Regions:
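Conserved alpha-helical scaffold segments that buttress catalytic/binding sites
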Residues: 1-186
Length: 186
Protein backbone atom coordinates (compact mmCIF):
# COMPACT_ATOMS: atom_id res chain seq x y z
CA UNK A 1 0.00 0.00 0.00
CA UNK A 2 1.33 3.39 -0.97
CA UNK A 3 -0.03 6.19 1.19
CA UNK A 4 -1.22 9.16 -0.83
CA UNK A 5 -0.14 12.67 0.13
CA UNK A 6 -3.66 13.81 -0.72
CA UNK A 7 -6.78 12.18 0.72
CA UNK A 8 -10.14 11.96 -0.98
CA UNK A 9 -12.46 14.79 0.11
CA UNK A 10 -11.24 15.15 3.69
CA UNK A 11 -11.35 11.39 4.38
CA UNK A 12 -8.96 11.77 7.26
CA UNK A 13 -10.35 9.46 9.95
CA UNK A 14 -8.07 6.84 11.48
CA UNK A 15 -8.51 3.25 10.28
CA UNK A 16 -9.61 2.06 13.72
CA UNK A 17 -12.49 4.55 13.94
CA UNK A 18 -13.59 4.46 10.29
CA UNK A 19 -16.51 2.37 9.08
CA UNK A 20 -15.61 3.05 5.43
CA UNK A 21 -12.20 2.63 3.80
CA UNK A 22 -11.40 4.12 0.42
CA UNK A 23 -8.44 2.82 -1.56
CA UNK A 24 -6.97 3.45 -4.98
CA UNK A 25 -6.16 0.85 -7.60
CA UNK A 26 -3.89 2.55 -10.15
CA UNK A 27 -3.70 0.18 -13.11
CA UNK A 28 -3.72 0.39 -16.88
CA UNK A 29 -3.16 -3.17 -18.04
CA UNK A 30 -5.99 -3.92 -20.49
CA UNK A 31 -7.07 -0.45 -21.58
CA UNK A 32 -7.68 -0.61 -25.32
CA UNK A 33 -8.63 2.93 -26.33
CA UNK A 34 -6.58 5.48 -24.48
CA UNK A 35 -4.20 4.72 -21.58
CA UNK A 36 -4.33 6.72 -18.38
CA UNK A 37 -6.67 4.90 -16.00
CA UNK A 38 -3.69 4.37 -13.69
CA UNK A 39 -3.81 8.10 -12.91
CA UNK A 40 -7.47 8.02 -11.87
CA UNK A 41 -7.04 7.56 -8.08
CA UNK A 42 -4.81 10.63 -7.73
CA UNK A 43 -6.89 12.75 -10.09
CA UNK A 44 -10.11 11.74 -8.31
CA UNK A 45 -8.55 12.74 -5.00
CA UNK A 46 -7.46 16.11 -6.41
CA UNK A 47 -10.83 16.84 -7.97
CA UNK A 48 -12.80 15.70 -4.92
CA UNK A 49 -11.99 18.99 -3.21
CA UNK A 50 -14.26 20.73 -5.70
CA UNK A 51 -17.28 18.68 -4.59
CA UNK A 52 -19.94 19.90 -2.20
CA UNK A 53 -20.10 17.78 0.95
CA UNK A 54 -23.64 18.64 2.09
CA UNK A 55 -26.67 16.62 0.94
CA UNK A 56 -29.92 18.58 1.27
CA UNK A 57 -31.86 15.36 0.61
CA UNK A 58 -30.35 13.61 3.60
CA UNK A 59 -29.54 16.75 5.59
CA UNK A 60 -26.06 15.35 6.20
CA UNK A 61 -22.47 16.36 5.60
CA UNK A 62 -20.25 13.74 3.97
CA UNK A 63 -17.47 14.88 6.28
CA UNK A 64 -19.55 13.66 9.25
CA UNK A 65 -18.85 10.09 8.12
CA UNK A 66 -15.81 8.26 9.43
CA UNK A 67 -13.86 7.48 6.26
CA UNK A 68 -10.23 6.42 6.02
CA UNK A 69 -8.24 6.87 2.81
CA UNK A 70 -5.80 3.95 2.78
CA UNK A 71 -3.85 5.21 -0.22
CA UNK A 72 -3.12 3.17 -3.34
CA UNK A 73 -2.39 -0.49 -3.79
CA UNK A 74 1.00 -1.05 -5.39
CA UNK A 75 0.29 -1.76 -9.07
CA UNK A 76 1.21 -5.16 -10.47
CA UNK A 77 2.56 -3.70 -13.68
CA UNK A 78 1.55 -5.79 -16.69
CA UNK A 79 -0.23 -8.47 -14.64
CA UNK A 80 -3.98 -7.94 -14.38
CA UNK A 81 -4.52 -11.27 -12.58
CA UNK A 82 -2.04 -10.39 -9.85
CA UNK A 83 -3.60 -6.94 -9.46
CA UNK A 84 -7.09 -8.44 -9.14
CA UNK A 85 -5.76 -10.89 -6.53
CA UNK A 86 -4.23 -8.01 -4.58
CA UNK A 87 -7.53 -6.12 -4.66
CA UNK A 88 -9.40 -9.26 -3.58
CA UNK A 89 -7.05 -9.81 -0.61
CA UNK A 90 -7.24 -6.18 0.52
CA UNK A 91 -11.03 -6.02 0.14
CA UNK A 92 -11.41 -9.28 2.06
CA UNK A 93 -9.34 -7.83 4.92
CA UNK A 94 -11.50 -4.70 4.99
CA UNK A 95 -14.67 -6.77 5.12
CA UNK A 96 -13.26 -8.96 7.90
CA UNK A 97 -12.54 -5.75 9.84
CA UNK A 98 -16.20 -4.71 9.30
CA UNK A 99 -15.25 -1.87 6.96
CA UNK A 100 -17.18 -0.81 3.87
CA UNK A 101 -14.69 -0.92 0.97
CA UNK A 102 -14.71 1.77 -1.73
CA UNK A 103 -12.26 1.31 -4.58
CA UNK A 104 -11.37 4.15 -6.92
CA UNK A 105 -9.16 4.05 -9.84
CA UNK A 106 -7.90 1.97 -12.57
CA UNK A 107 -9.70 0.13 -15.26
CA UNK A 108 -12.93 -1.86 -15.22
CA UNK A 109 -11.26 -5.28 -14.98
CA UNK A 110 -10.13 -4.57 -11.43
CA UNK A 111 -13.70 -4.66 -10.12
CA UNK A 112 -13.58 -8.46 -10.22
CA UNK A 113 -11.39 -8.56 -7.10
CA UNK A 114 -13.78 -6.43 -5.07
CA UNK A 115 -16.88 -8.20 -6.42
CA UNK A 116 -15.49 -11.62 -5.51
CA UNK A 117 -14.58 -10.57 -1.95
CA UNK A 118 -17.91 -8.85 -1.30
CA UNK A 119 -19.91 -11.75 -2.81
CA UNK A 120 -18.22 -14.22 -0.47
CA UNK A 121 -19.55 -12.25 2.50
CA UNK A 122 -22.84 -11.16 0.89
CA UNK A 123 -23.88 -13.81 -1.67
CA UNK A 124 -27.17 -12.03 -2.34
CA UNK A 125 -25.42 -8.91 -3.65
CA UNK A 126 -26.46 -7.21 -6.88
CA UNK A 127 -24.52 -4.98 -9.24
CA UNK A 128 -25.79 -1.71 -10.69
CA UNK A 129 -23.63 -1.12 -13.77
CA UNK A 130 -23.73 2.36 -15.35
CA UNK A 131 -21.77 2.34 -18.61
CA UNK A 132 -22.04 2.82 -22.34
CA UNK A 133 -20.81 -0.73 -23.02
CA UNK A 134 -22.04 -4.12 -21.89
CA UNK A 135 -18.61 -5.53 -20.88
CA UNK A 136 -20.14 -9.00 -21.23
CA UNK A 137 -17.68 -10.74 -23.53
CA UNK A 138 -16.30 -14.03 -22.33
CA UNK A 139 -12.97 -13.44 -24.07
CA UNK A 140 -11.58 -10.20 -25.52
CA UNK A 141 -8.53 -10.44 -27.78
CA UNK A 142 -7.75 -13.83 -26.25
CA UNK A 143 -7.93 -12.47 -22.67
CA UNK A 144 -10.44 -13.57 -20.04
CA UNK A 145 -9.50 -10.67 -17.73
CA UNK A 146 -10.08 -7.34 -19.41
CA UNK A 147 -12.19 -4.21 -19.27
CA UNK A 148 -14.44 -5.71 -21.97
CA UNK A 149 -15.46 -8.78 -19.98
CA UNK A 150 -15.56 -7.64 -16.36
CA UNK A 151 -19.34 -8.05 -16.12
CA UNK A 152 -19.13 -11.54 -17.58
CA UNK A 153 -16.60 -12.41 -14.85
CA UNK A 154 -19.00 -10.86 -12.31
CA UNK A 155 -21.81 -13.02 -13.67
CA UNK A 156 -19.63 -16.11 -13.16
CA UNK A 157 -19.37 -15.11 -9.49
CA UNK A 158 -22.97 -13.98 -8.88
CA UNK A 159 -25.12 -15.91 -11.35
CA UNK A 160 -28.17 -14.92 -13.38
CA UNK A 161 -30.24 -11.77 -12.89
CA UNK A 162 -27.86 -10.18 -10.35
CA UNK A 163 -26.51 -7.52 -12.72
CA UNK A 164 -28.56 -4.47 -13.69
CA UNK A 165 -27.13 -2.43 -16.54
CA UNK A 166 -28.04 1.18 -17.35
CA UNK A 167 -27.03 3.47 -20.20
CA UNK A 168 -25.79 0.71 -22.47
CA UNK A 169 -25.55 1.98 -26.05
CA UNK A 170 -23.11 -0.40 -27.71
CA UNK A 171 -21.52 -3.80 -27.63
CA UNK A 172 -21.28 -6.93 -29.71
CA UNK A 173 -24.55 -8.50 -30.87
CA UNK A 174 -23.83 -11.73 -28.98
CA UNK A 175 -23.40 -9.74 -25.74
CA UNK A 176 -26.90 -8.30 -26.08
CA UNK A 177 -28.37 -11.70 -26.91
CA UNK A 178 -26.58 -13.26 -23.94
CA UNK A 179 -27.75 -10.44 -21.63
CA UNK A 180 -31.42 -11.12 -22.44
CA UNK A 181 -31.15 -14.39 -20.53
CA UNK A 182 -28.62 -13.55 -17.83
CA UNK A 183 -28.74 -9.87 -16.80
CA UNK A 184 -31.14 -6.95 -16.61
CA UNK A 185 -30.47 -4.14 -19.07
CA UNK A 186 -32.31 -0.93 -19.77
Amino acid sequence: MKKSTLTFLFCDSEYSEANTVLFGAPFDGTTSFRPGTRFAPQIMRQESYGLEVYSPYQNKELTDKKIFDAGDLVPAIGNVGLMIDSIYDFTKKLISDNKLPIMIGGEHSLSVGTIKAVAEKYPDMYILHFDAHTDLRDVYYEHKLSHANVLYRAWEILGDQKIFQFGIRSGAKDEFEWAKNHSNSS
